[in-house]
Amino acid sequence: MALDPECFLDAEYLDNLLGDDGEPAQLPLLSRQIDAWQLEQASAYAGAAAAAVEQHNARAFAQALAIYSAPLASVLGCWLQGMSAPGVFEDPAQLRLMQLFAHDVGVGYPNASRAHHFNALLGQLQLTTYALAPAQLATLPDLNDDAFELPALLQALSRRSDAFGDELCGVDWALRAVGLCPGWAAMGQLEGLALELGRLDLSAAFPGLEPASLRHISQWVAQRIIEQGEERQARLLRGANWLFGALRRWNARLYNASLTATSPQQAMAHLMQRLARVGAVYHQNYLIEGRSLALWLEDAQHDPLPLLDVLSRSRLIVPGNAKKSLLVTSLVAPTGRMFRIFSEADLNVIRQWIDWLPQAGTTEQLPRQPIDSCAMAARPTTASAADTGHWPQSLREAYFVLQGRALQPTTLKFAHAYVSRWLERSRQSLKTSERQLPEQWGTQVLRGWLLDKHDQNGQQFDDSDPAQIPSREEIVESTLQLAPLTLIDGAWLQGFTDVGLASSHVGYTLFQTYWDELGNGIEALNHPKIYRDGLREMDFELAPTGSREFAEDPRLYEESFRLPVYWLCLGKLPVTFMPEILGMNLAMELSGVGGSYRSARRFLRHYGFSTAFVDLHNTIDNVSTGHSAWAADAIDAYMRSLTSAEQVAAQWQRVRVGYESLAPMPGKWTSMLRRLGLSSAGNVLPRPARAATSSRYLHHLPITREVLLETHEP
């Protein structure tokens, strides 16, 4: 469930899962504890690796570590995927968190995330069976449930970053402080394997970006939270301390899993424990030392060592001589009763164990690491009425409610209904629209069409009369009314910060576009901030975008919130409406390039206003290497993934509707109202099946103190 970017999880349940371990350690002390733990674990893994090498099992040692690590490695970076939200688009600390996340996903490249690098390592270790997406990994029966405990909770917390934002910053602080997990570091030190582990070091920057100290960035963000006071600091410390405890438990299990390669006894114990449940069904009548083998196998599901002890004394085994042992010779031959019960890898484990048995009394086994118990909270059976969320009654209310990220069930229904109504109007508009995508998709079709549209935009600008300039009042009013839209620039792509989408062939350019809109971690390049500076130049000082005061500002028309609400809804439904988002994104990125941005520049310069915003967009949205080109590439990547002509036709039509949805032509009723001088803004709202109210808004708290002080709580 937590892998779904559109899911909603109960914050109270997640809060119980985090638990309360008493007084948390302060960051300086916790940092020293992490350093000491890493040294201790480095020594432990070095001993285990040496034992594995002595048994000629270096590769098996690395494989055991990699297999258990797969669930966690598959979601690296996920704890930050839900932090960015429209209401905090201008918060400098949020921009730095997005910078950290960009390094984690390998912004600008497909399949360049830390998780994808781990999958490449799995290939080197001949473990491609495990090189899967997280949802597929969860279906593999041979992966222990406890391997999913930490990654599952990290995913779940990320879906409620409105409630756990400070805790997640603490989680990030601790993970960057650890850097490279000790078990993974041990994999990189094995001779003869040449495994490159640098990309798994969470403190290391992505080579495709400017060098940066991710640890220092995370520490800077943590300091901004500490400045907010004791309550926020306590939540930060809770997240950091919880993560360190959870990571120690995960690491102990990882270490214990690696011991299978350090000793034939450990490997055999693991094998018997894995196969015991199935075997218990078939051996009721076979006795070993007067007891049914089925009963021995039943006990072995929890403790396999007693079974190994009696098995070593049975007639099935000749200690020190696997070639004469019935268990791995006649019983598993084509005519034997256990033919094909064991895989070839299983048989190798059994043979090594048999040959090793004479040394059992003189060989010291590496001890397993103890695992601290962690109480799990019970899942709530019902949700309170307050948890159902809001069904906004006006566009202004919808704009305010949707400034967060998570959507409660009722609000989710509203968002789905709003988008569906908008798209239905766009579908009707498409029948007569003159600004359509080609009727059919094909390779190279979209890029050629894109260049043609760019030429048309440029020609329209060249043909325009430079002397025809709107009045200063018109320019100022237009800039003001665009504020609800432009101050959430990129909101339609919000869902593509999901770690899986952000690094996919379809989504990587969309995430890069989103990251560009927010300034690439640099406050001075943040598009909403640049636009707000332009508003100040025109003597408009607007409230923070995420505040109720902004949504209720009487200077802003109700009509000015229609398209922004569509963007806000669309961005929270990246899976349900992916084709439409792809089409709308292309329409948006292409809308001003070559033409209207140049016209806007002319008008703004004429009256002495800054042209920074339109200048920036006219360059980064270009059709060759900019956002418009990336938008077309994302569509092509999506269409190439489809496998049948029917799918191509259906999905392309959805993309075309999405393109039209940026500016669908008004219907007859809307046109009539406009001729009468009446507003139709409220008419776009879907009507609820029943009234729904909630006292809570799932908004994100600003991290930077200056931003927090500017924000007015509802």
Predicted regions: what they are:
Residues M1, T382-F400, T693-P714:
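Terminal accessory/targeting
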Residues M1-A46, G389-Q459:
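Extended, charge-enriched "interface" segments that sit outside catalytic cores
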Residues A25-A204, G245, A252-Q273, Q436-H606, ...:
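Active-site-proximal alpha-helical scaffolds that flank and shape metal-associated catalytic sites
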Residues L97, C169, Q233-A240, S343, ...:
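Hydrophobic packing residues in well-ordered alpha-helices of helical domains and bundles
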Residues E149-A152, S213-R224, L326, S596-R598:
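Extended amphipathic alpha-helical scaffold segments
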Residues R199-S218, E298, H302-D309, S596, ...:
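C-terminal hydrophobic structural anchor segments
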Residues F206-Q266, I620-T711:
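Acidic, carboxylate-rich catalytic segments that either coordinate divalent cations
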Residues R253-S394:
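Aromatic- and Gly/Pro-enriched helix-to-coil junctions and flexible linker segments
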